[in-house]
Amino acid sequence: MTDPRVVSLAPSATATVAALGAADRLVGVTNHCDLSDDADAGSAHGIGSPTAVGGWLNPDLDRVAGLDPDVVLTSDGLQADLADACRERGLDVAHREPSTLDEVVEGFATRGADVGRPEAGERLAADARERLDRIADAVADRPRPTAYCEEWSDPPMAAGNWVPDAVRAAGGRYPFVEPGERSREVDPAAVERADPDHVVVHVCGHGDRVDPAAVAERDWVDAPVHVLDDSLLNQPSPALLDGVERLARLLHPEAFSVAGADDRP
């Protein structure tokens, strides 16, 4: 069977394809996709690297179609119209829109099937579940501190989607947004009333380039401020499992004090 020609229009999909060992099938990606650690990207189709087709919300669809993909990968409700536009051009689109942690993990298997690597997808999902089980064991029967997670700061927005699940999986409480609900602007007074034990900042598009001191200066914040790379919590990719592990270590450092600093739970 010939390896499919894959165009990924979502950084999270690209990261998942790479984790599946299928980056060699990518013939096109967005300007925001990171394949810097995957030298094999595009190699199954004799190209040095996948073609950049533009932004993740405004890619050049003529360029996408010109790559003659067998499947185009999209993700998130913000790309639903884009997925429809690709279908109108006769392209086969695999659009995935996870909103909870369970759906993200299940999506690894689905993505494997999307790119012709179903067994790899099942393995990746199983590995993610095992990691979550290890975290659950490590934080079991411990007090659950409250965390406030902010994915945008002007105005302040409490993270939603899978982040509430991630905090709970890490052994914390998250009273700001229900699992599966979209991120939303938060009332500073509500955050103050919740009296979080930790503030976690992961601003979209900023990586880890946020000054925690600027957040700590707010008169409604009275807790340690932690800055995480936004890819650890904002994307439904395998990096989200790294994010859950980081959260668990922030919320329960004593649970991991015996293991090495870089060891998984």
Residue locations for each model-derived region?
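N-terminal ligand-binding lobe of clamshell/alpha-beta domains
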Residues: 1-265
